Amino acid sequence: MAKKHRYTTVQRKQERQKEEEYIKELEQRIQDYDVKNNKAVFFKDLPISKSTLKGLNEASFIKMTDIQRDSIVTSLQGHDVFGTAKTGSGKTLAFLVPVLEKLYRERWTEFDGLGALIISPTRELAMQIYEVLVKIGSHTQFSAGLVIGGKDVNFELERIAKINILIGTPGRILQHMDQAVGLNTSNLQMLVLDEADRCLDMGFQKTLDAIVGNLPPDRQTLLFSATQSQSISDLARLSLTDYKKIGTIDSSEDGPATPKTLQQSYIIADLADKLDVLYSFIKSHLKTKMIVFFSSSKQVHFVYETFRKMQPGISLLHLHGRQKQRARTETLDKFFRAQQVCLFATDVVARGIDFPAVDWVIQVDCPEDVDTYIHRVGRAARYGKKGRSLIILTPQEEAFLTRMAAKKIEPGKLTIKQSKKKSIKPQLQSLLFKDPELKYLGQKAFISYVKSIYIQKDKEVFKFDELPTEEFANSLGLPGAPRIKIKGMKAIEQAKKLKNTSRSLLSLSKANDDGEINDKKDKQVRTKYDKMFERKNQTILSEHYLNITKSQAQEDEDEDFITVKRKDHELKEEDLPQLTVPTSRRAQKKALSKKASLSTKGNATKMVFDDEGQAHPVYELEGEEEFHKKGDAEEQKKEFLSKEAEIMADRDVSDKIIQKEKKQEKKRKRLEAMRREMEAAYADEYSDEDEEGGNVAYLGTGNLSDDMEEYSSDEESRKTKKSKTVDYRFDKKNKTISEDTDIMEIQEPETIEDLESLTARLIEG
């Protein structure tokens, strides 16, 4: 029987016409909407589709915040948006609703490819955005995908070609752009940067530039954050020239960027007393939910392990960027569900994460700038709820208060009651003495903190030379300050760039023009035993730990009985033997080598010939008189720089085009290779049916006509087997097809002659 459709062809056509008319009406309402004069309160008052509105209602999003009211319709009207709003003000919905509406009005399908790209600086924030999108977009027909580090890349590669809305971190998105054959960004409609200031900073600069280079320039761009850099160069990198700035928070009317319901305070304490203050605070606030921020993951790990053994009386959790993704997700779930818990964390959860009912935000280490402080304290007092924050500053870091005052943030000063303060130094010393691995953690925590102070840019706040290293080491329970080797700022910046670049991207950068990666090492099968023997120690048996303790061991041990008096010294000429003739063939070959003889003749000079045949050096120095005849030195310098800048700008455009074409060519070749592999696999799968006996040759009878007859009969039988059977029901009286009459089984017509014979048979009945 024929499949019964829900609607007939006429009804489906009417439904399409209704939807087109509804979309036109919606677009007209958007263009007529006056953002300045219309102060809507509810989402239903906005010109958005019924499916999006239904998803918002089911997710309990009824009333709008200020940033949502001001930015959603502006984004719907097609403008680029540069949005700033306080933490916890609902910026996520401010860009998710325009994304859904844009694709709905464009009638986007899975065959149109990627329509919207949302970039988040952290994995946790990307996961939160994805969860909100799934809730409010439950009644739409779009496909959404989440690509973050720590997940299976092959699983994402198989599905990324059919995704309409892609959410992810910069590194993984760029990896898919270079590696995923089916990912096509040429038709992208919207680019969204959540926490845009973090995405635009030096850590993600090259990655983001590479992503933007793969996107079409006529897209719509939305930037949102609680604190944003207004650098013209940052905006120019995103092709953001004509944009609408919405929700400015640094004006005199709005006051500070922190929520009004947040009560802020600070404590001045010595560096050696910070852990004592923290432990005493936790002991006196056991029935609260708090987040404690540190500057490095090693500090988080050390404080978590030591406090866990001292059992302060509250559940302890820790979260940092060096953990596996599964452990990070499980920790977040536990913290979401718990009501009385303390989370030790780094800045991976400082931005955008919507933690429910956080009572306290503690900052043990001073943040690098006021923007980081704003994002940290923004984890409390969200959506109008009350919250409190505390920052612990050393006497050397009091200048940070002036930085906060410049942004209209004035926390109150707290004093510590001596009766509530408890020293934990003896307990830490005892724990580190009993457990060498815990001592190693303490040494790494000490080194990471000192390095974090060294790399800070604000030297008025972070004074590296005034650090009390010995007292700080004793406060951690260490017997002395470990030896620290700092390589320099260039090496640290290079390490940061490598940290933000995925290994897959580094390997893809070594690919040839055909898109193939040539590994020098032969690919061998590595068993679990090979991996076990190749594994390096990460505890007290590691090389890093031995290097730390080497200086202490050298000081403790006595002088050796036999010592080296001198090393790598020069011998006197009278002690050297007279060697006039080479003593071996190797020495003779070395003495007669062309390379060795050229080394004694000095550097060669390269000459070029002019039109008259005169030889000139490649680089000739101009005389002083000739130089002054051309004009002032500063003017010549400016003229030279302007010319070179124009040349570099022209070449930059052509280089980008060439680079883009090379990437597309690599993708095309990779896609062609995949197609050939699939065809070969398909041919191998069905080759057995055609061969009917493997590699066996059958000889004929000697008569060519008999062999041809057998071949034709085999072909006809094979066609008969493969041909389909069609049931035609024909009413002889009414000359119409019916379901209740006799059934005549025939073959499906393949040629015009078959079709004519079938028609004749049906007419004759």
Swiss-Prot record:
GO terms for cellular component: nucleolus; small-subunit processome. Transmembrane segments: none annotated. One of its GO terms (biological process) is rRNA processing. Keywords: ATP-binding, Helicase, Hydrolase, Nucleotide-binding, Nucleus, Ribosome biogenesis, RNA-binding, rRNA processing. ATP binds at residues 85-92. It catalyses: ATP + H2O = ADP + phosphate + H(+). GO terms for molecular function: ATP binding; ATP hydrolysis activity; identical protein binding; RNA binding; RNA helicase activity. It is found in: Nucleus, Nucleolus. SMART domains: DEXDc, DUF4217, HELICc. A motif (DEAD box) lies at residues 194-197. Residues 274-432 form the Helicase C-terminal domain. SUPFAM superfamilies: P-loop containing nucleoside triphosphate hydrolases (SSF52540). Residues 72-246 form the Helicase ATP-binding domain. A motif (Q motif) lies at residues 41-69. Its EC number is 3.6.4.13. Residues 575-615, 682-725 are annotated as: Disordered. Interacts with the U3 and U14 snoRNAs. Associates with pre-ribosomal complexes. ATP-dependent RNA helicase required for ribosome biogenesis. Involved in the release of U14 snoRNA in pre-ribosomal complexes. Required for pre-rRNA cleavage at site A2. Belongs to the DEAD box helicase family. DDX10/DBP4 subfamily. The Q motif is unique to and characteristic of the DEAD box family of RNA helicases and controls ATP binding and hydrolysis. This is ATP-dependent RNA helicase DBP4. It comes from Candida glabrata (strain ATCC 2001 / BCRC 20586 / JCM 3761 / NBRC 0622 / NRRL Y-65 / CBS 138).
